[in-house]
Amino acid sequence: MPSAFDNLCGPGKPLQAEPPNAKEFEGLCAMGLDKLSDARGPGLKLVSQFDLAYNAAHALCLAALRWHGYRSSNRYIVFQLLPHTLQLGPEVWRILAKCHDVRNRGEYEGMLEITERLVIDLLGACDKVAAKVSALTPPSP
């Protein structure tokens, strides 16, 4: 039976199989954890916290996908695949998907609607992703 990853691979589909790369995995993890730490910096505006935390989440989720040996052609799929990459449920990936939508509305339509509640939820989701990614053994070089 094909995996959820295999079902999303192929021409016109959002994933492609690609062997994991230890340096890439470690770099994505380091970048994600640094951005997550920076998102909690004192004196940051909500929009800066959101931007840092969203990009931290994306880097960490992408690291998990790369660990499984796949590359994504779009940002959203790394959040949708969290049940398969890190065994995280909808309470996490739905927050990240909402943040992706908020980010896109801001980037492409100039309508950035960030609330303190959204940033708190995003940081909590990032913490769960970070804990799971940090528990992964880096792929062999």
Where do the PLM segments sit?
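Terminal alpha-helical segments
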Residues: M1-P141
